[in-house]
């Protein structure tokens, strides 16, 4: 029987907080407006909350470029703001530790008819950079909240993603699996609709069994 495995990316294949912390430290070291990291971090968090409240439900609410643009408003020029966002993501991606054994396991476990789908919140450009840099080249389909216009767990996101799954399940020749770090975002919809075998994990894919 065909396996359709629905993955999340962030904080599923790696520890998000470790990568984010390394990236913020790199940004702090590359600017001169703040001379104390704690003050910089507090101001960053305040800015992030303000942006996310304003853009509630909009996938752009996670944009680091928007955060930095507001954080450094009238302090540095736009070119420098753009550079800081690039520094953030370069550091984030390069500092992330991906378990190679996990990647090899997933690649080796994938049968010829199996499908690996990645459904993720975030910017499409950044998510593709992550999976390409980290060697996660086994996905048959990648869908981001940016291209859908809604974030998980919004039902509009799941309804769009489900279009790519329903045809297979209607043939009754497929089994659905869902894997992620957040029940509402990654598992609940698929479990309720397809009785998916689900794995709620904490940055350790080796705990999952197929």
Where would I find each of the regions flagged by the language model?
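Active-site neighborhood of HAD-like aspartate-dependent phosphohydrolases
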Residues: 1-46
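Asp-based, Mg2+/Mn2+-dependent phosphohydrolase catalytic module
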Residues: 1-3, 103, 107, 122-210
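Hydrophobic alpha-helical core bundles mediating ligand binding, dimerization, or RNAP-core interactions
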Residues: 20-28, 44-48, 68, 85-89, ...
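Alpha-helical elements of Rossmann-like donor-binding domains used by nucleotide-donor carbohydrate transfer enzymes
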Residues: 22-26, 66-70, 104, 156, ...
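Short, surface-exposed acidic
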Residues: 32-46, 73-86, 138-139, 168-174
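A metal-dependent, Asp-based hydrolase signature
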Residues: 49-87
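Short, acidic loop-to-helix structural element flanking the phosphoryl-transfer center
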Residues: 87-117, 155, 159
């Amino acid at each position: 029987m065909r396996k359709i495995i629905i993955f999340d990316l962030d904080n599923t294949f790696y520890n998000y907080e470790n990568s984010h912390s390394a990236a913020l430290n790199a940004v702090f070291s590359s600017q001169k407006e703040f001379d104390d990291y704690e003050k910089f971090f507090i101001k960053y968090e305040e800015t992030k909350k303000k942006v996310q409240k304003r853009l509630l439900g909009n996938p752009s609410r996670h944009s680091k470029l928007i955060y930095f643009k507001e954080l450094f408003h009238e302090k540095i020029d736009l070119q420098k703001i753009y550079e800081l966002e690039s520094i953030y993501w370069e550091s984030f991606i390069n500092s992330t530790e991906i378990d190679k054994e996990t990647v090899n396991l997933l690649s080796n476990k994938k049968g010829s008819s199996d499908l690996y789908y990645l459904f993720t919140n975030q910017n499409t450009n950044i998510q593709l950079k992550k999976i390409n840099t980290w060697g996660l080249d086994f996905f048959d389909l990648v869908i981001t909240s940016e291209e859908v216009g809604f974030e998980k767990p919004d039902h509009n996101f799941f309804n769009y993603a489900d279009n790519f799954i329903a045809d297979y399940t209607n043939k009754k020749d497929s089994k659905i699996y869902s894997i992620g770090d957040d029940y509402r975002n990654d598992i609940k919809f698929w479990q309720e609709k397809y009785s998916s075998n689900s794995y709620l994990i904490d940055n350790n894919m080796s705990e999952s069994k197929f």
